[in-house]
Amino acid sequence: MIITANEVINRLPIAKTFDVSKITPQIDSVIRQYLKPRLGLEFYEAINTDRISLGAGTPFAVYAPATAYTQGDTVIFNNVAFECIETPPAAGYNPTQVLYWQYYAPFTTAKYRDLWITGGLFDFVCNAVMIETIPFIHLNVQSAGLSVLSDNFGNAATTQDVERLLKTFAERTETAWNQVYNFLTLVNDNLNINNPVLYPLFAENC
């Protein structure tokens, strides 16, 4: 799969204790409705094939608190890949310590890592996932009917609150897509950039 629920949670300004089971089913929907139509099936498959699995058999070691990591090390922490960007002063500095770690785009090929982060594809996918997820965290869908979920530590969001949040994520999704599109079609002779040649499978570059 091109993204994990934990990556979405790590990227967006949402509770880090968010229930991943609410997000995971919506990733397939985003792939079908957002990614494949906009990227084109062949290009999407090329990106997805280049993706490094974060499950069993991943080339990255799982973060170990007792290990003394150094700059350049890559680990898996809560099913998200991180790269050590500065050697911590001692063992035990886990990837939540942003002075020493940053998110690592888990792709084999540099051009896809660049597209994922610099090109904005990561943000596009994350925000689209939330568009599909929010209705199912506001409403509890049961065979007996629908009910509004409540929070023991606050008030449940109103329909207007949900609509406003959905609008925000929709705007963020389209902003991210514009970034993706501009990146994939970018030509800059002064900087020796010709992304249509670098990403020939993108439908607009064919």
What are these regions (language model features)?
Residues 1-65, 70-73, 78, 87-122, ...:
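Conserved short "hinge" loops at termini or chain/domain junctions
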Residues 164-167:
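Long, hydrophobic, well-ordered secondary-structure blocks that form the structural core
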